A protein has these predicted regions:
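A short, structured loop/turn motif at beta-sheet edges
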Residues: 124, 140, 213-214, 284, ...
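Extracytoplasmic/secreted envelope proteins and their assembly/folding machinery
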Residues: 69, 116-118, 132, 164, ...
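Acidic, low-complexity Ser/Thr/Gly/Pro-rich repeat segments typical of extracellular/periplasmic
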Residues: 2-28, 32-247, 274, 412-415
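Gly/Pro-biased beta-strand-loop elements
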Residues: 229-339
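Short, charged beta-turn/beta-strand-edge "cap" motif at the junction between a beta-strand
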Residues: 121-123, 224-226, 266, 296, ...
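Extracytoplasmic/periplasmic, Sec-exported soluble proteins
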Residues: 60, 107-110, 155, 159, ...
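Exported/periplasmic cell-wall-interacting domains
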Residues: 159, 285, 297, 301-422
Length: 422
């Protein structure tokens, strides 16, 4: 492509302001105040200067398995910026070569997507050029899909409720995990810092650095639909999940003093005499989260490894049972131990209280509320697998469980990553 008044290239004076993400998003191309500077002119049509490799030119859909590559013709001026975005607002990450003559995508294109690509160039005088291209990608050849199920169910929860993402297939490769995690978004109002943590190859948990703010609203959504995750594996569509957070309710049980103190939005609202696990059956220390409530539960010692007929054997009908672990730890009514409540630990691991106090607790907590045990001789609460012990993991360790974390620290949201010079 020929432009009038070309002179010998002046690479030392080339101004490259199009790499500013804010300028791209706003559609602005100026980084000066005009006054005759070449960049103050209207961008020329760079159609003859830019080559899109791998895109069919006959109206056929592009193969989502192939990367997007953009180059400039020989003797033409360099690329200064490239953005590629689909109809849902997902940006494609890419790299711009140091000499400005080639840009290529560094993450897969989505299948069945409509893309708009905006290319910025300049001529030898530094005058800006622009080309815009749209194209569609076709369906993936493979039928293998990765489905994601978000949890918990829609509803209102306590400030300790983690978000879960359960995968239909195991994902073990670190690069594939990064693709999956980058596509799973959690937005909250008010906004708070948070991160995903890979529990295993099929489950991720998300939590904020601290508990959710009281009365927060949370939206969980996936951009994985149509995204290539690995060889012959593509993301499937996932419904959004919307949650509400209620009041901040935290119950702290001191096993050494045999009392539970309940706080609501930072204010003490009740103090309850309790009994916790006796020697050999000590209650777990640490932060737990309410998993559910059952008005009546049959509790048998055989379900926790106590032999039938032994001196520790029991078979009881228990009321106002608030579950905090899957292995059978509850806060519940224990009328048979009222004389010990507030003075001794005589249970098999549960937190027992009078029927009246248990009914009050049952009515004033919800799933996701925090139940913390301190000063027990029991083991520490497991982070995963026995309820939600997520809050017993330090924030630093939690971030290390993200696939987007490097030795330099956790990466930010890269869904809008712009091209970088290499």
């Amino acid at each position: 492509m020929t432009h009038p008044n070309r002179t010998t290239p002046r690479p030392a004076t080339v101004v490259r302001c199009a790499l500013l993400v804010s300028a791209l998003v706003a559609g602005a191309a100026a980084c000066g105040s005009g006054g005759g500077h070449p960049l103050a002119s209207r961008p020329y049509d760079a159609t003859g200067q830019v080559v899109f490799a791998g895109l069919p030119g006959d109206g056929r859909k592009a193969d989502p398995d192939k990367p997007l590559e953009i180059t400039v013709k020989d003797s033409e001026g360099p690329l200064t910026d490239v953005t590629a975005v689909d109809a849902t607002g997902r940006f494609v990450a890419g790299e711009l070569a140091a000499d400005g003559r080639r840009w290529h995508s560094t993450e897969p294109l989505a299948a069945n997507a409509h893309y708009t690509v905006r290319v910025s160039t300049e001529d030898d005088d530094g005058a800006p050029g622009r080309r815009v291209l749209t194209f569609d990608t076709g369906a993936p050849v493979s039928k293998k899909r990765l489905e994601v199920t978000f949890g918990p169910d829609a509803g209102t929860y306590g400030v300790g409720q983690p978000i879960t993402a359960t995968l239909s297939r195991p994902v073990k490769d670190p690069a594939q995990r990064a693709v999956v995690e980058r596509a799973l978004k959690v937005d909250s109002t008010p906004s708070v810092p948070g991160a995903w943590h890979w529990v295993d190859s099929k489950e991720l948990h998300y939590r904020p650095k601290d508990y959710w703010p009281a009365q927060a609203r949370i939206r969980v959504h996936s951009h994985l639909d149509g995204i290539k995750i690995g060889d012959r594996l593509w993301g499937a569509k996932t419904p959004d999940l919307n949650l509400k957070i209620g009041d901040k309710v935290v119950a702290v049980t001191d096993a050494s003093s045999h009392w539970m103190t309940v706080y609501k939005n930072g204010e003490e609202i009740n103090s309850i005499p309790v009994t916790t696990g006796k020697p050999g059956f000590e209650t777990r220390n640490g932060v737990k989260v309410v998993l559910g409530k059952e008005y009546n539960v049959r509790m048998r010692g055989t379900t926790v490894g106590i032999s039938a007929g032994s001196s520790e054997s029991y078979d009881l009908s228990v009321y106002y049972a608030t579950r905090v672990t899957w292995s059978g730890e509850y806060v519940h009514a224990a009328p048979w131990s009222v004389d010990s409540q507030g003075s001794a630990n005589v249970s098999h691991g549960c937190t027992g209280m009078s029927t009246g106090n248990a009914a009050w607790f049952y009515e004033n907590v919800r799933e996701g509320d925090v139940v913390k045990v301190i000063n027990s001789y029991g083991d520490d609460m497991e982070p995963f697998g026995n309820g939600f012990g997520d809050w017993n993991v330090t924030w630093k360790k939690w971030q290390e469980g993200s696939a987007l974390t490097t030795k330099k620290g956790p990466q930010g949201d890269t869904s809008r990553l712009q091209p970088t010079m290499v």
